[in-house]
Structures are given as structure tokens and as C-alpha cells.
């Protein structure tokens, strides 16, 4: 019997199962790490790697192989899944070190570490994700107790754990447990608290509050220093937020579940920031939080050298970039953007260029445009405008050398195309029609395309041709999603 569309859509979770997502392109452009389940009806998301040169895919970690395929999430991880609208089980997110040699992820409140250099079995995606020789989870080890002799090991952390992130050097993994921000040293197994709410109800470190995750596209609450010596972390106090009580219509005998929900016009969570050094120093970051209570985002990039905060007023008419002195917590104004209606939040900024310039977006000449400059230039209003008013910037995707990668709309607002802007020129990297996203590193371009010609997104890896030839496809990440 042929499936009806509603049945097929339900069985495939809206045709999302088997579709690759959450890509991470290594800095050398040689490897792509991503998430995907084994098939169009498989609800367990796995961790994969693509070798760009050979085009081979490797299955790095399958929660079924570590006995966590159907593990229940703790309330924090469940809330994180809800924020990103993730319905499948397994691995919802991962993070890597700067060199993409290790990846950390949490399943069922347990932290796992995967060796991306040698782990994984070759997989034929066209054959439905079956392993081609070897185990389904890779070989090799990073040390400590491994899972099933594979390159994926369970870290002996406090549980339940959420949002594990390796430091850029790959020496430590930070994570959040019971509202405390903790750090695990990989080599020794030492695990300790870096920021502790000390049992206070409604207070947590290192997690994004409800408004940040739902309205600002910020799903994290801490950022490693580039050298791994400290963490910039948020402290969220939800005690002012009102409770809502949600009943289960399918089980009227159950008590309603109480959750804190900041509905419009009611008190929000109070967010503050701290620099927590691995040496034990704990320094509060100071700014006018009464006038600018929203923490929109933060960053700590090696090229800039110190943390940057983006904060905004509650009416969203005033948004500012603040530079943070990590030694004292003192902030200084980098730039301020105001609007009588509101200032748009653009994902991906601030970003840093190798020479220390700060990339931002601003409304200039009736369009959202990319601007870049040193902090003094932003403060003086002399930052360079990199894009014309004929395109409207949607998102900054990152930087590659001195070029800024971003998405924008030109004549057709229904099309979102990929562009790069730098000292040399402005260039569109995708076709004009469709919705695209991308990552770029060392000249390698990972292009995600969605068009009316295909029900599934295509994921291609392209590299520049020789002697001025156009970019050519060198690899492709397969989709195992069903066709409607």
C-alpha cells in the first residue's frame, strides 16, 4: 500500500530524517563534520565526517552503538532540543576544537568525546548508510575508557551534562551540570567546577536563557578563550520570571508542569557575565545592564584578542558592541547602533578578520550592509562599508582570510544567495535563484542549496579552479531523506 503524504510526513518527521545538517568545515578545508541519521525513517542522529579530497564519508559516532539510542534527556537538554526544534533522538549538537581533531557531544546526560583523526568506518551513503568494513563507530582511542573499543569514549563527568565544548587547543572539555559550569581535563580526567550557583534555585551558569534561545538565535551561554585559559560565561537568574503551569491533556490525573515563562511585559531573567579562568580567578564583567539588559551574543576570537559582547535595550532600539578587558571585567564601547523602531539582530556578527578588524552589519542607505574596521574606526563611525545598497545582508557566515562570507538578497527577496566581500572584490558564490548557506575555509567552499527543483537540500564541496577557472565540485554529502 502506498503511503499517504500525511503518513509519510509523520513517519519521516517532516522529511528531516536522513538529511545532513550542522556542518563544521575544518580550518584547512579538508574535512567536514556533520550530523545525519542512517536513513529516512531512522530517528537517531549520528556524527559523520567527510574527507573532502577522497569524497569518502565516515560514521564517527552512532548513539545506538554506545547504548544511548533511546536515552531520555535531562530537563536542560530537553529544553535545548525544544529551542532548536529538534524532534529526532541521538546527537542534537556537537562542538570541536579549533583544529577539528576531537568532537564532544552529549546523549542522555552523558558526555562523549570522539577522535576525528582516526575514528570512523567508511560508509556508502547511497546504500542507506551501511558501514563498509570495520565497526559502525570508529577505531582508535584518545585514552581512558572507550566504548566498544571504538574511537568514541565516554568522559567520566558529573551527570546530567549538557552542551559540552572542547577548548580551542583540545586539552579540556567544558559542560554544564545542574546549573554549574564545569571543566574536564582530557589527559588526566580531572573534573572540577568553574562557576557554581551553589544550589540556588533559578540560577545557572553557561546556559542561554529562554529569550536568547527563542528570540535572539543564541543557543549557548559560554565561550572559550582562544588559548583555552579561561571561559566567558553567562550567569542567568530566573527568579524574577513568572511561572506558567502546563497540563497534559492526555493525562488529566498528572499534576501540571511548572515552567518559568517571560511573557510580554513581565520580568525577564537577569543576565550577567563573568570571566572564569582555569587558575580560579572569577571576574564579573561590568556594563549598564539596567539600560541594556539583553545579552544578544558574545565572542572571543584570537584575531581580536579579547571578548566582545553585544547588548541591547529591552525595546531593541539601542544595540551596542562592548569590548571586555578579561583581566578586570571593565568594558568599553566599540560602536552603538540605534533606530526609532528597532535594531535587527543579524546572526554571525561580530566576527573578526585576521588583522583584528571587527565585522558588523549596519543599516546604511536603505539596506543592511557589511562593515569592517578596527575598534577605533567603529567608534569614530569610519568603518569601511564592504557591500553595496543593491543587496540586503541576511547573515554573516564567517570569514576566510580577509574575505567575509555572508548571505544576502538582491532583486528577489525570496532568494537568499551566498556572497563574499573583501579588499579585492564582491562576488556571488551561489546561483541567483534559491536559498543557500555556506562555510568557507582555506578556499574550500561548502555550499548548501535549496531550490524548487529538488525536495531535498544538496550539499556540495567546491574548490577554486586553476588559472582563473570557476570553482568545481570535488565532493558531495549525500542525503538519505525520503522523497515526498
Sequence positions of predicted segments:
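Beta-propeller folds
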Residues: 1-426, 434
Amino acid at each position: 500500500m502506498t503511503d499517504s503524504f500525511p503518513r509519510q510526513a509523520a513517519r519521516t518527521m517532516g522529511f528531516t530524517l536522513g538529511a545532513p545538517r550542522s556542518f563544521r568545515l575544518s580550518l584547512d578545508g579538508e574535512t567536514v563534520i556533520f550530523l545525519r541519521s542512517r536513513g529516512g525513517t531512522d530517528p537517531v542522529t549520528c556524527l559523520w565526517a567527510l574527507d573532502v579530497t577522497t569524497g569518502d564519508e565516515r560514521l564517527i559516532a552512532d548513539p545506538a552503538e554506545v547504548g544511548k539510542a533511546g536515552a531520555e534527556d535531562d530537563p536542560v537538554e530537553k529544553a535545548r532540543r525544544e529551542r532548536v526544534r529538534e524532534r529526532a533522538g541521538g546527537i542534537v549538537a556537537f562542538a570541536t576544537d579549533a583544529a577539528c581533531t576531537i568532537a564532544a557531544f552529549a546523549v542522555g546526560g552523558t558526555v562523549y568525546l570522539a577522535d576525528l583523526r582516526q575514528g570512523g568506518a567508511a560508509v556508502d551513503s547511497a546504500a542507506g548508510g551501511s558501514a563498509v568494513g570495520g565497526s559502525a563507530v570508529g577505531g582508535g582511542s584518545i585514552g581512558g575508557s572507550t566504548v566498544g573499543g571504538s574511537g568514541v569514549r565516554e568522559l567520566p563527568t558529573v551527570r546530567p551534562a549538557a552542551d559540552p565544548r572542547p577548548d580551542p587547543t583540545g586539552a579540556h572539555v567544558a559542560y554544564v551540570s545542574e546549573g554549574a559550569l564545569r571543566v574536564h581535563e582530557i589527559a588526566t580526567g580531572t573534573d572540577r567546577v568553574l562557576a557554581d550557583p551553589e544550589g540556588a534555585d533559578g540560577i545557572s551558569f553557561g546556559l542561554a536563557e529562554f529569550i536568547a534561545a527563542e528570540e535572539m538565535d543564541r543557543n549557548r551561554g559560554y565561550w572559550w578563550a582562544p588559548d583555552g585559559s579561561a571561559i566567558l560565561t553567562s550567569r542567568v537568574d530566573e527568579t524574577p520570571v513568572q511561572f506558567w503551569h502546563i497540563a497534559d491533556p492526555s493525562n488529566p490525573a498528572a499534576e501540571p508542569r511548572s515552567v518559568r515563562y517571560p511573557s510580554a511585559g513581565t520580568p525577564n531573567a537577569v543576565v550577567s557575565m563573568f570571566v572564569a579562568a582555569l587558575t580560579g580567578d572569577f571576574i564579573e564583567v561590568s556594563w549598564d545592564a539596567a539600560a541594556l539588559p539583553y545579552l544578544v551574543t558574545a565572542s572571543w576570537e584570537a584575531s581580536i584578542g579579547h571578548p566582545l559582547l553585544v547588548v541591547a535595550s529591552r525595546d531593541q532600539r539601542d544595540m551596542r558592541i562592548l569590548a571586555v578587558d578579561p583581566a578586570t571585567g571593565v568594558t568599553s564601547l566599540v560602536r552603538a547602533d540605534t533606530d526609532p523602531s528597532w535594531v535587527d539582530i543579524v546572526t554571525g556578527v561580530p566576527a573578526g578578520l585576521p588583522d583584528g578588524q571587527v565585522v558588523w552589519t549596519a543599516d546604511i542607505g536603505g539596506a543592511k550592509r557589511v562593515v569592517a574596521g578596527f575598534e577605533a574606526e567603529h567608534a569614530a563611525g569610519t568603518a569601511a562599508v564592504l557591500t553595496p545598497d543593491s543587496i540586503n545582508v541576511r547573515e554573516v557566515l564567517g570569514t576566510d582570510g580577509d574575505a567575509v562570507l555572508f548571505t544576502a538578497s538582491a532583486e528577489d527577496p525570496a532568494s537568499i544567495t551566498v556572497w563574499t566581500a573583501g579588499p579585492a572584490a564582491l562576488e556571488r558564490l551561489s546561483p541567483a535563484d534559491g536559498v543557500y548557506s555556506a562555510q568557507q575555509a582555506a578556499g574550500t567552499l561548502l555550499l548548501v542549496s535549496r531550490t524548487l527543483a529538488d525536495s531535498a537540500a544538496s550539499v556540495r564541496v567546491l574548490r577554486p579552479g586553476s588559472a582563473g577557472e570557476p570553482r568545481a565540485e570535488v565532493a558531495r554529502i549525500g542525503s538519505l531523506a525520503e522523497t515526498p
